[in-house]
């Protein structure tokens, strides 16, 4: 993408639009905007690409509908409440539930909106670390979104199911999962606030336990590439 530079006081060339120049709109100072004609289209020339990571602020696992979709703070889960998970707990581990489980991952959505305000989203990625799975060779992660406002919900919520799927190839493995760009748009536009893990059924293939925010560098995080 083309860009514009100007000569600084010491003879150095400074790129416009890099946070060092503002223009007045009569009321406030704002980043400059400019376009050039490439012979076919007008191209914005003062935009910059940014890649920001947002570490989750909280996370948790939830029971299925047979226990009211409540968090693992209730009853006796074999996994600590901070672990988001999905899929069937029975018969592999826990006879207490006949159905699958869910997970919710929370972010500082206001901070994300502050970064993305006015931005064009180019790529959205989610980092997950699979601590455990029913099978040694892994399984399938099913990713959704939620719009809970606050640091913690005691009941599982989801507004978009199955927005992305990813194959994990074993226990104690991690990956960046590409999400649709509209997930970033919805975060920017205050339509969603976080991520869910939620298998469709009681299949062991979708039984995966993910690291939560108490697991240090293994904690879930979002990486968003955008231009503004």
What is each of the regions a protein language model found here?
Residues 29, 35, 42-112, 201, ...:
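Flexible, small-residue-rich N-terminal segments that precede or flank a structured functional core
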Residues 107-110, 117-133, 222:
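A short beta-strand element within beta-rich, extracytoplasmic domains
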Residues 131-134, 199-201, 228:
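Acidic glycine-/aspartate-rich tracts in secreted/extracellular proteins
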């Amino acid at each position: 993408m083309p860009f514009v530079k100007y000569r600084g006081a010491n003879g150095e060339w400074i790129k416009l639009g890099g946070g060092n120049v503002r223009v007045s709109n009569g009321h406030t100072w704002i980043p400059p905007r400019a376009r050039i004609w490439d012979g076919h289209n007008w191209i914005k020339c003062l935009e910059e690409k940014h890649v920001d990571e947002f570490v989750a602020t909280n996370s948790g696992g939830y029971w299925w509908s047979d226990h009211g979709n409540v968090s693992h703070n209730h009853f006796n889960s074999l996994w600590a409440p901070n672990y988001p998970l999905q899929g069937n707990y029975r018969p592999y581990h826990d006879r207490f539930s006949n159905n699958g489980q869910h997970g919710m991952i929370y972010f500082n959505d206001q901070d994300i909106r502050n970064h993305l305000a006015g931005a064009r989203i180019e790529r959205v990625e989610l980092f997950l670390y699979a601590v455990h799975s029913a099978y040694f060779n892994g399984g399938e992660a099913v990713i959704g979104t939620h719009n809970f406002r606050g640091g913690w919900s005691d009941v599982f919520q989801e507004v978009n199911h199955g927005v992305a799927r990813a194959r994990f190839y074993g226990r104690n493995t991690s990956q960046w999962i590409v999400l649709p760009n509209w997930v970033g748009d919805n975060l920017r536009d205050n339509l969603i606030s976080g991520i869910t893990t939620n298998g469709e059924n009681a299949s062991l293939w979708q039984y995966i336990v993910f690291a939560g925010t108490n697991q240090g560098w293994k904690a879930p995080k979002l990486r968003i590439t955008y231009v503004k």
